[in-house]
From Swiss-Prot:
Keywords attached to this entry: 4Fe-4S, Iron, Iron-sulfur, Isoprene biosynthesis, Metal-binding, Oxidoreductase
Binding residue positions for (2E)-4-hydroxy-3-methylbut-2-enyl diphosphate: H41, H74, H124, T164, S220, S221, N222, S263
Protein name: 4-hydroxy-3-methylbut-2-enyl diphosphate reductase
Binding site for dimethylallyl diphosphate: H41, H74, H124, S220, S221, N222, S263
Length: 279
C-alpha cells in the first residue's frame, strides 16, 4: 500500500492563528474563558481546549458579565460586539483576517445603499456573521439553480461577496450569470486562497491514486468541498479520525491519497497515516 499526502492539507493560516490565540488565552486563565460557538469545526481539537478549561457556549447571554469571550475564526455579526461591550466582556477576537475583510466590504457597501449578495450556506456560522454586517438583509445564494430562480431589481445596486470556503468553480458560474442579469454589481472574490490551493492540490492527488481519504469535521464546509472534489474522480472516504477507517475496504486499494480540511490538526493526520502504514 502506497500512501500519498496532498501538498496542502490541514490547518490554514486563519485556523492556526485562531487556535494559537485561544490556547494562549486558556493558558493564562484557569477559569472564565468562554468561546462563542466551537472554536473550529473539529470536535477532537476543540476537546483539547475544553480539557484546559475553555467553555463553549452558543449564546452570548449565557456568558457572565466581566468574563473573557473568544470570538472564533468564522467571525460574528456586528451586534455581538455591542452586546459584549454592554456586558463588559474582554474580547479575544480570533476572526480570520480574510473574513474580517468581508465584514468591512459588506458594511461599507451596505452603508452606501447597495444590496448585498453572499454566495454561501446561510446556516454556516461564517455566512451568519457576514449577514450580520448588513443588518441581516443579504441575499444568500448556495447553488446556481437557486440563483437562476431568483428575481432581481435592476434599479438597485448590488455588491457580491463569497463565503471563504466555497468552490471556486461555483463562484465563477454564479458571477457569470449575475453579470448578464444585473446592470450594476460589484464583484468581490473573497474565496480564501488556501481554499483554492487545497482543492487544487486534492484534485491533482486524486488523479494519481486509487482512492482518497479526506480527514475533517463533519460540519466543516471546506472539508465537504474537498470530499466533493475528490469523489468526482475516485472513490472517496470522509472521516474525522482513524477509528472510522474500514480496513477491509481500504485493503482493496494499492495507492491511497490523503487530504484534510482547514480545521484538521496535524496530529490527527499523522494518526491516520501511521494507522495505514501498519496495515
Amino acid at each position: 500500500m502506497n500512501i500519498k499526502i496532498a501538498k496542502n492539507a490541514g490547518f490554514c493560516f486563519g485556523v492556526k492563528r485562531a487556535m494559537k490565540m485561544a490556547w494562549d488565552e486558556v493558558e493564562k486563565n484557569d477559569s472564565g474563558i468562554y468561546a462563542l460557538g466551537p472554536l473550529i469545526h473539529n470536535k477532537q481539537a476543540v476537546a483539547k481546549y475544553e480539557e484546559k478549561g475553555l467553555k463553549t457556549v452558543n449564546e452570548i447571554d449565557t456568558i457572565p458579565n466581566h468574563e473573557n469571550m473568544i470570538i472564533r475564526s468564522h467571525g460574528v455579526p456586528e451586534n455581538i460586539y455591542k452586546e459584549a461591550k454592554d456586558k463588559k466582556l474582554k474580547i479575544v477576537d480570533t476572526t480570520c483576517p480574510f473574513v474580517k475583510k468581508i465584514h468591512t466590504v459588506v458594511s461599507e457597501y451596505h452603508n452606501k445603499g447597495y444590496e448585498i449578495i453572499v454566495i454561501g450556506d446561510m446556516k454556516h456560522p461564517e455566512v451568519i456573521g457576514i449577514n450580520g454586517w448588513c443588518e441581516n438583509s443579504a441575499i444568500i445564494i448556495k447553488t446556481l439553480e437557486q440563483m437562476e430562480n431568483m428575481e432581481f431589481d435592476n434599479s438597485k445596486r448590488y455588491c457580491l461577496v463569497a463565503q471563504t470556503t466555497i468552490n471556486p468553480e461555483l463562484y465563477i458560474s454564479i458571477v457569470n450569470k449575475l453579470s448578464d442579469k444585473l446592470e450594476e454589481i460589484v464583484f468581490n472574490d473573497t474565496i480564501c486562497s488556501a481554499t483554492k490551493t487545497r482543492q487544487e492540490s486534492a484534485k491533482e492527488l486524486a488523479k494519481e491514486v486509487d482512492c482518497m481519504i479526506v480527514i475533517g469535521g463533519k460540519h466543516s464546509s471546506n472539508t465537504q468541498k474537498l470530499v466533493k472534489v475528490c469523489e468526482d474522480l475516485v472513490p472517496t472516504f470522509a472521516i474525522e479520525t482513524k477509528d472510522e477507517l474500514d480496513v477491509n475496504t481500504l485493503k482493496k486499494y494499492k495507492n491511497l491519497g490523503i487530504t484534510a480540511g482547514a480545521s484538521t490538526p496535524n496530529w490527527i493526520i499523522e494518526e491516520v497515516v501511521t494507522f495505514l502504514e501498519n496495515l
